[in-house]
Protein backbone atom coordinates (compact mmCIF):
# COMPACT_ATOMS: atom_id res chain seq x y z
CA UNK A 1 0.00 0.00 0.00
CA UNK A 2 1.61 3.60 -0.91
CA UNK A 3 1.71 7.26 0.15
CA UNK A 4 2.01 10.18 -2.22
CA UNK A 5 1.71 13.93 -1.97
CA UNK A 6 -1.35 15.12 -3.84
CA UNK A 7 -2.02 18.63 -5.06
CA UNK A 8 -5.21 20.67 -5.01
CA UNK A 9 -7.82 19.93 -7.63
CA UNK A 10 -10.51 22.22 -8.99
CA UNK A 11 -13.89 20.87 -7.95
CA UNK A 12 -17.42 22.22 -8.21
CA UNK A 13 -19.27 23.08 -5.04
CA UNK A 14 -22.05 20.87 -3.79
CA UNK A 15 -25.52 22.03 -4.74
CA UNK A 16 -28.63 20.82 -2.97
CA UNK A 17 -32.16 21.85 -3.94
CA UNK A 18 -33.66 24.64 -1.86
CA UNK A 19 -37.14 24.19 -0.50
CA UNK A 20 -39.27 26.44 1.68
CA UNK A 21 -41.60 23.58 2.49
CA UNK A 22 -41.32 22.54 6.17
CA UNK A 23 -40.62 18.90 6.85
CA UNK A 24 -40.49 16.78 9.97
CA UNK A 25 -37.42 14.83 11.03
CA UNK A 26 -38.42 12.14 13.55
CA UNK A 27 -34.82 11.33 14.46
CA UNK A 28 -31.54 13.02 15.31
CA UNK A 29 -29.87 14.75 12.38
CA UNK A 30 -26.30 15.49 11.50
CA UNK A 31 -26.03 19.03 10.23
CA UNK A 32 -23.04 20.39 8.35
CA UNK A 33 -23.28 24.10 7.58
CA UNK A 34 -20.70 26.10 5.68
CA UNK A 35 -21.40 29.81 5.35
CA UNK A 36 -19.94 32.44 3.02
CA UNK A 37 -17.17 30.34 1.60
CA UNK A 38 -15.00 32.41 -0.69
CA UNK A 39 -13.44 30.59 -3.59
CA UNK A 40 -9.71 31.22 -3.85
CA UNK A 41 -7.07 29.84 -6.15
CA UNK A 42 -5.31 27.61 -3.64
CA UNK A 43 -7.35 27.62 -0.47
CA UNK A 44 -10.84 27.69 0.95
CA UNK A 45 -11.97 29.76 3.89
CA UNK A 46 -14.95 28.14 5.52
CA UNK A 47 -16.89 27.98 8.73
CA UNK A 48 -18.47 24.63 9.42
CA UNK A 49 -20.59 23.35 12.27
CA UNK A 50 -21.98 20.01 13.24
CA UNK A 51 -24.88 19.43 15.57
CA UNK A 52 -26.74 16.42 16.93
CA UNK A 53 -30.36 16.86 17.96
CA UNK A 54 -32.12 14.31 20.10
CA UNK A 55 -35.71 15.48 19.84
CA UNK A 56 -38.26 15.54 17.05
CA UNK A 57 -38.69 18.97 15.55
CA UNK A 58 -39.87 20.76 12.47
CA UNK A 59 -37.24 22.27 10.26
CA UNK A 60 -37.59 24.55 7.26
CA UNK A 61 -35.07 25.16 4.51
CA UNK A 62 -34.48 28.56 2.99
CA UNK A 63 -31.73 29.41 0.53
CA UNK A 64 -29.76 26.30 1.40
CA UNK A 65 -29.56 26.99 5.15
CA UNK A 66 -31.46 24.96 7.73
CA UNK A 67 -33.42 27.11 10.18
CA UNK A 68 -34.73 25.43 13.34
CA UNK A 69 -38.34 26.27 14.20
CA UNK A 70 -38.16 24.58 17.58
CA UNK A 71 -35.95 24.64 20.63
CA UNK A 72 -32.62 23.06 19.90
CA UNK A 73 -32.05 19.91 21.90
CA UNK A 74 -28.83 18.67 23.40
CA UNK A 75 -26.02 19.49 20.98
CA UNK A 76 -22.85 17.48 20.78
CA UNK A 77 -20.12 19.49 19.14
CA UNK A 78 -17.22 17.12 19.66
CA UNK A 79 -17.22 16.03 16.04
CA UNK A 80 -17.26 19.52 14.56
CA UNK A 81 -13.57 19.73 13.77
CA UNK A 82 -13.52 16.39 11.99
CA UNK A 83 -16.43 17.16 9.71
CA UNK A 84 -15.18 20.67 9.10
CA UNK A 85 -11.99 19.18 7.76
CA UNK A 86 -13.86 16.70 5.61
CA UNK A 87 -15.98 19.42 4.03
CA UNK A 88 -13.24 21.98 3.51
CA UNK A 89 -10.77 19.48 2.12
CA UNK A 90 -13.25 18.27 -0.43
CA UNK A 91 -13.59 21.64 -2.15
CA UNK A 92 -10.87 23.54 -3.99
CA UNK A 93 -11.66 26.57 -6.12
CA UNK A 94 -9.99 28.57 -8.82
CA UNK A 95 -11.87 31.84 -9.03
CA UNK A 96 -12.61 34.67 -6.58
CA UNK A 97 -16.36 34.32 -7.00
CA UNK A 98 -18.48 34.08 -3.86
CA UNK A 99 -19.76 30.58 -3.22
CA UNK A 100 -23.25 29.75 -2.02
CA UNK A 101 -23.94 28.62 1.51
CA UNK A 102 -24.21 24.88 1.95
CA UNK A 103 -26.11 22.76 4.42
CA UNK A 104 -26.42 18.99 4.48
CA UNK A 105 -28.73 17.18 6.89
CA UNK A 106 -28.54 13.45 7.59
CA UNK A 107 -30.21 11.13 10.08
CA UNK A 108 -27.76 10.22 12.83
CA UNK A 109 -27.89 6.82 14.51
CA UNK A 110 -28.64 6.64 18.22
CA UNK A 111 -26.03 3.86 18.47
CA UNK A 112 -22.81 5.64 19.38
CA UNK A 113 -20.51 3.23 17.54
CA UNK A 114 -22.57 3.63 14.36
CA UNK A 115 -22.48 7.42 14.75
CA UNK A 116 -18.68 7.21 14.81
CA UNK A 117 -18.68 5.32 11.52
CA UNK A 118 -21.11 7.87 10.05
CA UNK A 119 -18.57 10.55 10.83
CA UNK A 120 -15.89 8.41 9.16
CA UNK A 121 -18.18 8.05 6.16
CA UNK A 122 -18.36 11.83 5.68
CA UNK A 123 -14.59 12.08 6.08
CA UNK A 124 -13.89 9.34 3.55
CA UNK A 125 -16.46 10.69 1.09
CA UNK A 126 -14.82 14.12 1.15
CA UNK A 127 -11.32 12.77 0.58
CA UNK A 128 -12.47 10.68 -2.36
CA UNK A 129 -14.37 13.61 -3.82
CA UNK A 130 -11.17 15.65 -3.69
CA UNK A 131 -8.55 13.19 -4.91
CA UNK A 132 -9.99 10.07 -6.61
CA UNK A 133 -8.34 9.52 -9.98
CA UNK A 134 -11.67 9.18 -11.82
CA UNK A 135 -13.53 12.51 -11.59
CA UNK A 136 -16.76 10.81 -12.73
CA UNK A 137 -16.61 8.43 -9.74
CA UNK A 138 -17.34 5.52 -12.06
CA UNK A 139 -20.08 7.55 -13.77
CA UNK A 140 -22.26 8.04 -10.71
CA UNK A 141 -23.56 10.87 -8.53
CA UNK A 142 -21.08 10.83 -5.64
CA UNK A 143 -23.05 13.37 -3.63
CA UNK A 144 -26.11 11.14 -3.77
CA UNK A 145 -24.06 8.11 -2.69
CA UNK A 146 -23.18 9.93 0.55
CA UNK A 147 -26.83 10.67 1.31
CA UNK A 148 -27.90 7.14 0.40
CA UNK A 149 -25.25 5.45 2.53
CA UNK A 150 -25.85 7.71 5.52
CA UNK A 151 -29.54 6.80 5.47
CA UNK A 152 -28.70 3.09 5.11
CA UNK A 153 -26.49 3.28 8.20
CA UNK A 154 -29.17 4.91 10.35
CA UNK A 155 -31.02 1.75 11.52
CA UNK A 156 -27.83 -0.25 12.16
CA UNK A 157 -26.68 -1.14 15.66
CA UNK A 158 -23.07 -2.27 15.22
CA UNK A 159 -19.88 -0.69 13.92
CA UNK A 160 -19.11 -3.79 11.84
CA UNK A 161 -22.39 -3.45 9.97
CA UNK A 162 -21.80 0.27 9.46
CA UNK A 163 -18.29 -0.32 8.12
CA UNK A 164 -19.85 -2.84 5.75
CA UNK A 165 -22.09 -0.11 4.32
CA UNK A 166 -19.13 2.26 3.98
CA UNK A 167 -17.08 -0.36 2.17
CA UNK A 168 -20.03 -1.13 -0.09
CA UNK A 169 -20.16 2.55 -1.07
CA UNK A 170 -16.46 2.48 -1.92
CA UNK A 171 -16.93 -0.64 -4.03
CA UNK A 172 -19.24 1.27 -6.38
CA UNK A 173 -16.18 3.23 -7.56
CA UNK A 174 -15.08 0.15 -9.49
CA UNK A 175 -11.52 0.36 -8.13
CA UNK A 176 -10.46 -2.48 -5.80
CA UNK A 177 -7.50 -0.43 -4.57
CA UNK A 178 -9.66 2.36 -3.15
CA UNK A 179 -10.73 0.89 0.15
CA UNK A 180 -11.07 1.43 3.87
CA UNK A 181 -9.49 -0.69 6.58
CA UNK A 182 -10.67 -0.71 10.19
CA UNK A 183 -8.55 0.66 13.06
CA UNK A 184 -7.39 -2.85 14.01
CA UNK A 185 -6.47 -3.67 10.42
CA UNK A 186 -4.62 -0.38 10.08
CA UNK A 187 -2.42 -1.15 13.07
CA UNK A 188 -1.33 -4.38 11.38
CA UNK A 189 -0.69 -2.50 8.13
CA UNK A 190 1.51 0.03 9.88
CA UNK A 191 3.68 -2.75 11.26
CA UNK A 192 4.58 -3.72 7.71
CA UNK A 193 5.16 -0.09 6.71
CA UNK A 194 7.33 1.20 9.52
CA UNK A 195 9.22 -2.02 10.20
CA UNK A 196 8.64 -1.96 13.97
CA UNK A 197 6.36 -3.89 16.29
CA UNK A 198 6.01 -4.97 19.88
CA UNK A 199 5.85 -8.73 20.06
CA UNK A 200 7.92 -11.89 20.32
CA UNK A 201 9.57 -12.10 16.88
CA UNK A 202 7.82 -15.13 15.36
CA UNK A 203 7.06 -15.51 11.65
CA UNK A 204 4.09 -17.88 11.34
CA UNK A 205 1.99 -19.10 8.44
CA UNK A 206 -0.82 -21.55 7.77
CA UNK A 207 0.29 -24.90 6.39
CA UNK A 208 -1.63 -25.23 3.08
CA UNK A 209 -2.67 -28.87 3.48
CA UNK A 210 -3.71 -28.89 7.13
CA UNK A 211 -4.34 -25.23 7.94
CA UNK A 212 -2.18 -25.60 11.07
CA UNK A 213 -0.07 -22.63 12.14
CA UNK A 214 3.60 -23.35 11.56
CA UNK A 215 6.68 -21.38 12.63
CA UNK A 216 8.51 -20.14 9.53
CA UNK A 217 11.39 -18.45 11.36
CA UNK A 218 12.31 -16.21 14.27
CA UNK A 219 13.71 -12.70 14.12
CA UNK A 220 17.35 -13.01 15.15
CA UNK A 221 17.85 -11.94 18.77
CA UNK A 222 14.11 -11.76 19.47
CA UNK A 223 12.43 -13.37 22.51
CA UNK A 224 11.31 -16.28 20.32
CA UNK A 225 14.85 -16.77 19.01
CA UNK A 226 16.33 -16.67 22.51
CA UNK A 227 13.78 -19.27 23.66
CA UNK A 228 15.04 -21.72 21.06
CA UNK A 229 11.88 -21.87 18.96
CA UNK A 230 12.62 -23.55 15.63
CA UNK A 231 11.31 -23.48 12.09
CA UNK A 232 8.67 -26.14 11.49
CA UNK A 233 7.22 -26.23 15.01
CA UNK A 234 3.44 -26.02 15.12
CA UNK A 235 1.81 -23.28 17.19
CA UNK A 236 -1.20 -24.84 18.91
CA UNK A 237 -2.16 -22.49 21.75
CA UNK A 238 -1.76 -18.84 22.84
CA UNK A 239 -2.55 -17.86 26.44
CA UNK A 240 -4.67 -20.96 26.91
CA UNK A 241 -6.68 -20.41 23.71
CA UNK A 242 -6.56 -23.21 21.15
CA UNK A 243 -5.89 -22.05 17.61
CA UNK A 244 -8.27 -24.26 15.64
CA UNK A 245 -9.68 -22.24 12.73
CA UNK A 246 -7.52 -19.20 13.65
CA UNK A 247 -5.64 -17.70 10.71
CA UNK A 248 -2.05 -16.50 10.85
CA UNK A 249 -2.90 -12.78 11.03
CA UNK A 250 -5.31 -13.30 13.94
CA UNK A 251 -2.71 -15.41 15.74
CA UNK A 252 -0.02 -12.79 15.11
CA UNK A 253 -2.26 -10.15 16.68
CA UNK A 254 -2.59 -12.30 19.81
CA UNK A 255 1.20 -12.56 20.05
CA UNK A 256 1.70 -8.80 19.85
CA UNK A 257 1.35 -6.57 22.86
CA UNK A 258 2.93 -3.95 25.06
CA UNK A 259 6.65 -4.29 25.79
CA UNK A 260 7.22 -5.90 29.20
CA UNK A 261 4.09 -8.06 29.13
CA UNK A 262 4.22 -11.83 28.63
CA UNK A 263 2.49 -14.33 26.37
CA UNK A 264 2.41 -18.08 26.95
CA UNK A 265 2.36 -20.35 23.93
CA UNK A 266 2.29 -24.08 23.30
CA UNK A 267 4.28 -25.61 20.47
CA UNK A 268 4.04 -29.06 18.93
CA UNK A 269 7.33 -30.42 17.68
CA UNK A 270 6.84 -32.45 14.50
CA UNK A 271 9.78 -34.70 13.57
CA UNK A 272 10.99 -35.51 10.10
CA UNK A 273 8.57 -38.43 9.70
CA UNK A 274 5.62 -36.11 10.29
CA UNK A 275 4.65 -37.62 13.65
CA UNK A 276 4.21 -35.66 16.87
CA UNK A 277 7.12 -35.71 19.29
CA UNK A 278 5.62 -33.79 22.19
CA UNK A 279 4.14 -30.44 23.15
CA UNK A 280 6.06 -27.84 25.11
CA UNK A 281 4.95 -24.63 26.80
CA UNK A 282 7.00 -21.43 26.49
CA UNK A 283 6.47 -18.12 28.29
CA UNK A 284 7.79 -15.25 26.17
CA UNK A 285 8.34 -11.59 27.12
CA UNK A 286 7.19 -9.08 24.53
CA UNK A 287 9.84 -6.69 23.25
CA UNK A 288 10.49 -4.18 20.47
CA UNK A 289 11.01 -6.10 17.23
CA UNK A 290 12.87 -4.53 14.35
CA UNK A 291 11.84 -5.88 10.95
CA UNK A 292 14.05 -5.25 7.95
CA UNK A 293 12.69 -5.68 4.41
CA UNK A 294 16.26 -6.32 3.22
CA UNK A 295 18.32 -9.50 3.28
CA UNK A 296 21.60 -9.96 1.47
CA UNK A 297 24.34 -12.43 0.65
CA UNK A 298 27.59 -12.53 -1.31
CA UNK A 299 27.85 -15.20 -4.00
CA UNK A 300 31.49 -16.09 -4.80
CA UNK A 301 32.24 -17.65 -8.17
CA UNK A 302 35.12 -18.23 -10.56
CA UNK A 303 35.16 -16.40 -13.88
CA UNK A 304 36.00 -18.21 -17.17
CA UNK A 305 39.54 -16.85 -16.96
CA UNK A 306 40.02 -18.28 -13.46
CA UNK A 307 39.53 -15.13 -11.41
CA UNK A 308 37.54 -15.10 -8.17
CA UNK A 309 34.55 -12.76 -8.44
CA UNK A 310 31.84 -11.75 -6.00
CA UNK A 311 28.20 -10.96 -6.78
CA UNK A 312 26.12 -9.16 -4.20
CA UNK A 313 22.57 -10.50 -3.83
CA UNK A 314 19.95 -8.21 -2.26
CA UNK A 315 16.40 -9.39 -1.62
CA UNK A 316 13.79 -6.66 -1.06
CA UNK A 317 10.51 -8.05 0.29
CA UNK A 318 8.51 -4.82 0.71
CA UNK A 319 8.83 -1.05 0.38
CA UNK A 320 8.69 0.05 3.99
CA UNK A 321 9.88 3.31 5.50
CA UNK A 322 13.28 1.77 6.19
CA UNK A 323 13.76 0.05 2.81
CA UNK A 324 16.08 2.64 1.24
CA UNK A 325 18.31 3.12 4.29
CA UNK A 326 18.52 -0.63 4.90
CA UNK A 327 19.46 -1.23 1.26
CA UNK A 328 22.07 1.52 1.30
CA UNK A 329 23.68 -0.05 4.36
CA UNK A 330 23.67 -3.50 2.75
CA UNK A 331 25.27 -2.23 -0.47
CA UNK A 332 27.92 -0.23 1.40
CA UNK A 333 28.82 -3.34 3.39
CA UNK A 334 29.19 -5.42 0.23
CA UNK A 335 31.18 -2.69 -1.52
CA UNK A 336 33.64 -2.91 1.37
CA UNK A 337 34.00 -6.63 0.59
CA UNK A 338 34.94 -5.98 -3.06
CA UNK A 339 31.67 -7.06 -4.65
CA UNK A 340 31.84 -6.40 -8.42
CA UNK A 341 28.21 -6.85 -9.52
CA UNK A 342 24.72 -7.03 -8.04
CA UNK A 343 21.45 -8.93 -8.26
CA UNK A 344 18.40 -7.09 -6.89
CA UNK A 345 15.56 -9.56 -6.26
CA UNK A 346 12.06 -8.04 -6.45
CA UNK A 347 10.22 -11.31 -7.06
CA UNK A 348 6.95 -11.58 -5.14
CA UNK A 349 7.42 -8.07 -3.74
CA UNK A 350 3.85 -6.68 -3.78
CA UNK A 351 4.91 -3.05 -3.31
CA UNK A 352 4.39 -0.71 -0.40
CA UNK A 353 5.25 2.95 -0.05
CA UNK A 354 5.82 4.67 -3.40
CA UNK A 355 8.20 7.12 -1.78
CA UNK A 356 10.35 4.19 -0.63
CA UNK A 357 10.45 2.82 -4.18
CA UNK A 358 11.65 6.15 -5.54
CA UNK A 359 14.26 6.43 -2.78
CA UNK A 360 15.62 2.97 -3.58
CA UNK A 361 15.85 3.84 -7.29
CA UNK A 362 18.01 6.85 -6.47
CA UNK A 363 20.57 4.59 -4.78
CA UNK A 364 21.42 3.15 -8.21
CA UNK A 365 21.15 6.22 -10.48
CA UNK A 366 23.01 9.48 -11.08
CA UNK A 367 21.95 12.93 -12.22
CA UNK A 368 18.45 14.21 -12.88
CA UNK A 369 16.88 11.08 -14.34
CA UNK A 370 13.11 10.67 -14.63
CA UNK A 371 11.98 7.91 -12.28
CA UNK A 372 8.31 7.71 -13.24
CA UNK A 373 5.49 9.68 -14.84
CA UNK A 374 2.15 10.20 -13.10
CA UNK A 375 -1.23 10.89 -14.71
CA UNK A 376 -3.68 12.75 -12.47
CA UNK A 377 -7.49 12.87 -12.51
CA UNK A 378 -7.43 15.61 -15.14
CA UNK A 379 -5.27 13.50 -17.46
CA UNK A 380 -2.17 15.66 -16.94
CA UNK A 381 1.11 13.73 -17.23
CA UNK A 382 3.92 14.88 -14.93
CA UNK A 383 7.46 13.53 -14.46
CA UNK A 384 9.02 12.76 -11.10
CA UNK A 385 12.73 13.46 -11.48
CA UNK A 386 15.82 13.02 -9.36
CA UNK A 387 17.80 16.11 -8.40
CA UNK A 388 21.58 15.78 -8.60
CA UNK A 389 21.52 12.10 -7.70
CA UNK A 390 24.67 10.15 -6.81
CA UNK A 391 24.56 6.36 -7.04
CA UNK A 392 25.95 4.27 -4.20
CA UNK A 393 27.60 1.98 -6.78
CA UNK A 394 28.06 1.84 -10.54
CA UNK A 395 28.68 -1.91 -10.68
CA UNK A 396 26.59 -3.94 -13.18
CA UNK A 397 23.07 -4.72 -11.98
CA UNK A 398 20.41 -7.32 -12.80
CA UNK A 399 16.89 -7.04 -11.37
CA UNK A 400 14.83 -10.20 -10.86
CA UNK A 401 11.05 -9.82 -11.35
CA UNK A 402 8.04 -12.08 -11.71
CA UNK A 403 4.24 -11.99 -11.76
CA UNK A 404 4.30 -11.22 -8.02
CA UNK A 405 6.30 -8.00 -8.50
CA UNK A 406 3.74 -5.20 -8.27
CA UNK A 407 3.21 -1.50 -7.74
CA UNK A 408 6.32 0.10 -6.21
CA UNK A 409 8.33 -2.91 -7.44
CA UNK A 410 7.28 -2.06 -10.98
CA UNK A 411 8.13 1.61 -10.47
CA UNK A 412 11.62 0.63 -9.33
CA UNK A 413 12.15 -1.96 -12.07
CA UNK A 414 10.92 0.47 -14.73
CA UNK A 415 13.12 3.29 -13.46
CA UNK A 416 16.28 1.16 -13.46
CA UNK A 417 15.51 -0.51 -16.79
CA UNK A 418 14.37 2.50 -18.81
CA UNK A 419 17.33 4.58 -17.63
CA UNK A 420 19.73 1.89 -18.86
CA UNK A 421 20.90 0.94 -15.40
CA UNK A 422 19.73 -2.68 -15.16
CA UNK A 423 18.74 -5.76 -17.12
CA UNK A 424 15.43 -7.36 -16.09
CA UNK A 425 15.39 -11.14 -15.69
CA UNK A 426 12.36 -13.28 -14.87
CA UNK A 427 8.69 -13.08 -15.88
CA UNK A 428 6.30 -10.26 -16.76
CA UNK A 429 5.34 -8.24 -13.69
CA UNK A 430 1.88 -8.01 -12.12
CA UNK A 431 0.69 -4.78 -13.79
CA UNK A 432 -0.52 -2.51 -10.98
CA UNK A 433 0.04 0.97 -12.35
CA UNK A 434 -2.00 2.91 -9.82
CA UNK A 435 -0.86 4.97 -6.87
CA UNK A 436 -2.80 5.20 -3.62
CA UNK A 437 -2.70 7.85 -0.95
CA UNK A 438 -3.16 6.62 2.62
CA UNK A 439 -4.97 8.79 5.15
CA UNK A 440 -5.57 7.90 8.79
CA UNK A 441 -9.10 8.96 9.71
CA UNK A 442 -10.30 10.26 13.05
CA UNK A 443 -11.58 6.90 14.29
CA UNK A 444 -8.20 5.25 13.65
CA UNK A 445 -9.24 3.59 10.40
CA UNK A 446 -7.37 4.32 7.17
CA UNK A 447 -8.57 5.23 3.70
CA UNK A 448 -6.66 4.15 0.60
CA UNK A 449 -7.56 6.24 -2.45
CA UNK A 450 -6.26 5.76 -5.97
CA UNK A 451 -5.04 9.25 -6.84
CA UNK A 452 -3.00 8.69 -10.00
CA UNK A 453 -1.81 6.24 -12.61
CA UNK A 454 1.82 5.94 -13.53
CA UNK A 455 3.91 5.23 -16.62
CA UNK A 456 7.52 4.09 -16.85
CA UNK A 457 10.21 6.66 -17.76
CA UNK A 458 9.85 5.54 -21.39
CA UNK A 459 6.11 6.31 -21.13
CA UNK A 460 5.17 2.63 -21.24
CA UNK A 461 1.78 1.69 -19.79
CA UNK A 462 2.09 -0.52 -16.71
CA UNK A 463 -1.45 -0.82 -15.35
CA UNK A 464 -2.97 -4.19 -16.31
CA UNK A 465 -0.01 -4.72 -18.67
CA UNK A 466 3.07 -5.17 -16.50
CA UNK A 467 6.72 -4.94 -17.50
CA UNK A 468 8.29 -7.58 -19.73
CA UNK A 469 11.79 -8.78 -18.75
CA UNK A 470 14.76 -8.63 -21.10
CA UNK A 471 15.55 -12.27 -20.36
CA UNK A 472 12.82 -14.70 -19.37
CA UNK A 473 13.26 -17.46 -16.84
CA UNK A 474 11.18 -19.43 -14.36
CA UNK A 475 12.68 -20.39 -11.04
CA UNK A 476 13.04 -24.13 -11.06
CA UNK A 477 13.64 -24.61 -7.38
CA UNK A 478 11.01 -22.38 -5.77
CA UNK A 479 8.96 -19.38 -6.84
CA UNK A 480 11.16 -17.02 -4.87
CA UNK A 481 13.52 -17.00 -1.98
CA UNK A 482 11.97 -15.52 1.12
CA UNK A 483 13.75 -13.12 3.41
CA UNK A 484 13.94 -15.83 6.06
CA UNK A 485 15.80 -18.22 3.74
CA UNK A 486 18.49 -15.72 2.78
CA UNK A 487 18.77 -14.12 6.22
CA UNK A 488 21.95 -15.96 7.17
CA UNK A 489 24.62 -15.64 4.52
CA UNK A 490 26.42 -18.95 5.03
CA UNK A 491 23.34 -21.12 4.67
CA UNK A 492 21.79 -19.09 1.87
CA UNK A 493 24.53 -19.20 -0.77
CA UNK A 494 23.95 -22.85 -1.80
CA UNK A 495 20.23 -22.14 -2.10
CA UNK A 496 20.88 -19.05 -4.19
CA UNK A 497 23.18 -20.95 -6.52
CA UNK A 498 20.42 -23.53 -7.01
CA UNK A 499 17.94 -20.83 -8.07
CA UNK A 500 17.78 -20.98 -11.86
CA UNK A 501 16.94 -17.28 -12.23
CA UNK A 502 19.90 -16.30 -10.05
CA UNK A 503 22.05 -18.47 -12.33
CA UNK A 504 20.66 -16.67 -15.40
CA UNK A 505 21.32 -13.32 -13.73
CA UNK A 506 24.93 -14.30 -13.01
CA UNK A 507 25.36 -15.33 -16.65
CA UNK A 508 24.07 -11.93 -17.81
CA UNK A 509 26.39 -10.12 -15.40
CA UNK A 510 29.38 -12.13 -16.62
CA UNK A 511 28.48 -11.31 -20.22
CA UNK A 512 28.38 -7.61 -19.39
CA UNK A 513 31.70 -7.80 -17.61
CA UNK A 514 33.25 -9.65 -20.57
CA UNK A 515 31.89 -7.11 -23.03
CA UNK A 516 32.92 -4.18 -20.88
CA UNK A 517 29.34 -2.90 -20.83
CA UNK A 518 28.80 0.02 -18.49
CA UNK A 519 25.87 0.10 -16.10
From Swiss-Prot:
Keywords: Chloroplast, Hydrolase, Plastid, Protease, Serine protease, Thylakoid, Transit peptide. Its EC number is 3.4.21.102. Transmembrane segments: none annotated. The keyword Plastid applies. It is found in: Plastid, Chloroplast thylakoid lumen. Its main location: plastid. Protease involved in the C-terminal processing of the chloroplastic D1 protein of photosystem II. This proteolytic processing is necessary to allow the light-driven assembly of the tetranuclear manganese cluster, which is responsible for photosynthetic water oxidation. This is Carboxyl-terminal-processing peptidase 3, chloroplastic. It comes from Arabidopsis thaliana (Mouse-ear cress).
Amino acid sequence: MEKVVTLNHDLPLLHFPNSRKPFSIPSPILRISSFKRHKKRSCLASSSRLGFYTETKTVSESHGVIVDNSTIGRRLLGLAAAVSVAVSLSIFCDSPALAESLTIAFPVSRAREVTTVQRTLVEAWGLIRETFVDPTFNHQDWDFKLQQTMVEMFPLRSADAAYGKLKAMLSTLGDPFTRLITPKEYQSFRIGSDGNLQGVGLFINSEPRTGHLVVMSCVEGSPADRAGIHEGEELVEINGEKLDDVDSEAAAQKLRGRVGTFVTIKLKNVNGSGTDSGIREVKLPRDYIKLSPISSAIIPHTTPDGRLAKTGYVKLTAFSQTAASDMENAVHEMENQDVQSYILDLRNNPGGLVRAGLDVAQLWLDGDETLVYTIDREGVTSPINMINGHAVTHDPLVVLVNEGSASASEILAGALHDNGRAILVGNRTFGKGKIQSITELNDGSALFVTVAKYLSPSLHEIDQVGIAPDVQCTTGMIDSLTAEIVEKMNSSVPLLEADSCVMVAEHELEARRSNGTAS
